[in-house]
Amino acid sequence: MVSNHGVERVIPLCTGNPIWRMSLKILIARLNHETNTFSPVPTPLAAFDPVYGEDAYQANLGMRTAMAAFIDLAEKAGATLITPLSAMANPSGPVHACAYDELTACILAAAPGCDAVLLDLHGAMVAENTPDGEGDLLERLRHALPTVPIGVALDLHGNITQKIVDNSSVIVGFKTYPHVDMYETGEHTAQLVLAMLQGKSSYSVHWHPLPLMSHTLRSTTLYGAMRRAVQTACAGEGPELPAISVFAGFSLADIEAPCVSVVITCLNSLNGKALAEEMCDHLAKQIWAERAEFVYVSEPLSDSMERALVLAIDADRPVLLLDHSDNCMSGGTCDTMDVLQAAVSHGLKNMAVGPLCDPQAVNIMFKAGIGSKLDIALGNKVALNPQGLVKQPMQIKGTVRALSEGTYTASGPIYTGQLCSMGRTVLLETDVASIVVTERPHEPFDIGVFHIVGLDPSTYRFLLLKSRMYCRPVFEPLAHALVECDSPGPTSSDYSLFPFTRVRRPVYPLDQM
C-alpha cells in the first residue's frame, strides 16, 4: 500500500514472539548531509538524488548503509516497513530551504500510525532555514509521535545539539573514520529500538559537549586521541550502557557549537543514568586532556612536494598525495589546482590524478572526442568564498584518452554496493599526468573512479587524490607512502581562513584554553 511518498511492506511475523500480537509499523528513512557553511557548492534538491517509497527500499538492499541494516533487522523481526525516503548529498553549502522542507515533509508525512522510527542521518546538516537540520526534524517527529521509540544512527562527525538529544530514544554514532562501520551502526541502533518495542528495555540519552573544534584530519580512528577515545567508549559499553558514542563534530560550520561531544544511550534506570553521567564525565576529561592532539598543523606545500620526491626514490609503489584542502566529502569543489600546479612545478611525473571537477572542460573534451589533442583551461573556476580567492585556471596540453558516462557501483569497503555517479567523465593524458575530469564533485573512496576510464592507479609513481580519509581503506594499501598536501582551499585545516561569527566562544583552538 503506497501513501504519499511511503510504501508499506508487510513481512510475516517471526514465530516465538508472543509479545507482538500484530505487525508493528516501523518508519525507516535516510537523509544525509554534512554542511560546510563556507562551501561555494550549492545544495539543491537534485544534489540528494532522492528516491521514494519502494525505490527507497530497493536502493538500500545489499548496501552497507545504516538504512540497509534497519531494513534487514526490521524484516527479520517481522515488522511492517514504511520507507518514505532515501536521500544523500555530498557535503556542500547550506541545504536549500525548499529542498530541506520537501525532504523532511516526506518523512513526516509517513509518521502517523508508526510504532517506531529508525533514521539514518548525518548529524551536521545546516539548511538555509535552520542551523539544526536533524534537530528540527526530530523535534517535529517527536511532536507527531510523542511516545514511540525514535532511533538515530549518526556520522562520527555529527554536530550534536540539545534538540537531537531531547527528541531521540536511542543515538548511536559511527566508531570509525574512515567510516567502514555504517551498517554495523545501523544494526546497533535497530537492535536497541527493537528491544524497546519488545518491552525488554527502556533507554535514556545523555550528552556531554566540549568546547573543542577538532580538525577532521585529527578525528581519524586509525591512530591518536580520537582512536583512544573510541577505544574507551567501546570498553565501557555493556548491559547498562549499551551505546557510547564519541562525536568529533564537523568544524567547517559556522553554527553555535560545531564541536566534539560524548553521547551515551543508557538503561532508563537510576543506576544506568548514574553510570552514564560518570562515563560521560570520564570520557570528556580524557578528550580534553588530549585536546592539542585534535589540532592539525600542516607543512608548507613546497615541503610536501620535496618530501614526496624523496619518498618516491626507489619506491616500487605509488606515493599517495592527498589534496585535503579541496576534499569533496567536506564540502570541497574538487576544482582547485594548487596541489597539481605545485606537483608539476616541482618536477613530479608519472602521476594519476583525480577526480577533478570541471563540467566546462568535460563538455569541451566530449565534443572533441577520443584521441583529440587539446590545450585546455582546467579547474579554478569556482570562487572560494568566503576567502574571496579568485584563481586562474591551469592551462594544460593533453590528449583525450577515454570518455565515460561516469556511473559505477562501489566495491567497498565504504558505501559498498552504492551506485555512484560522477557525471560525464574524461581521462585526459598529459606529458606528466593522467587526469580524471568529471562533471560532478566526487570523493575517491572507491577504485571505481579510475577503473571506469580504464586506468590502473597502482602503475603510477604518484597518485594525487582530492581526499582526506575516505580514500585510505582502498588506496593506502596500494601506496608506498602518503603525503598530506595543504593549500588555501574550501576545506583547509587553517581556521584563520574562515570567518566564524556564530560559534560560541571561548572554544579551542580558536581560543587558548
Pin down the residues of each PLM region.
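Hard-cation-handling environments
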Residues: L217-D431, V436-R440
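Glycine-rich phosphate/diphosphate-binding loops that line cofactor/substrate pockets in enzymes
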Residues: S23, K76-A79, T83, A109-V117, ...
